[in-house]
Amino acid sequence: MSGNQMAMGSEQQQTVGSRTVSVEEVPAVLQLRATQDPPRSQEAMPTRHNVRWEENVIDNENMNKKKTKICCIFHPQNEDEEECNHHSDDDGSSSSGSSSSESENEKDLDFNERRQRRLERRHRKLEKKRSYSPNAYEIQPDYSEYRRKQQEKKD
């Protein structure tokens, strides 16, 4: 093929004799459209979202408390399904009494009232002042004993 070819960005120029021809490449565009397939039958789709445990999930001490290494949060579809009576944030040392008496008193409350009390307990717990103590990554190990033993070996 006679002439020079050189690529510049998205344009290609080809020189033929004394004439230059520029060809511009148009980028390809992929357009996705939803199909008009009918929805699946009711047998294929579950009516409620339930947690299903596989056989390899461990039963925690025969208490029917399933544990996995993956943390997931279940979001109920209806407000009726949010009837949850456990409080994982409760530390049992609240100022108004024991956690069991609080839980018993909260059984008669609606969802918003229980939520409000749970938030109040969480705020009380976070407001408690703890003395600062460095974690394991912030503490510089003491190597003086190790160095002393190494020095004794050399002598």
UniProtKB/Swiss-Prot annotation:
One Pfam family hit: PPI_Ypi1
Disordered, as annotated region: 1-56, 79-155
Main location as per UniProt: nucleus
Source superkingdom: Eukaryota
Subcellular localization, as worded in the UniProt entry: Nucleus
Residue positions, PTM Phosphoserine: S22, S133
GO biological process, one term: intracellular monoatomic ion homeostasis
Residue ranges, compositional bias (Basic and acidic residues): 104-114, 144-155
Function: Regulator of type 1 phosphatases which maintains protein phosphatase activity under strict control. Regulates the nuclear localization of type 1 phosphatase GLC7 and SDS22, and is involved in the regulation of mRNA 3'-end processing. May also regulate the activity of type 1 phosphatase PPZ1.
Note in the entry: Present with 1080 molecules/cell in log phase SD medium.
Protein name: Type 1 phosphatases regulator YPI1
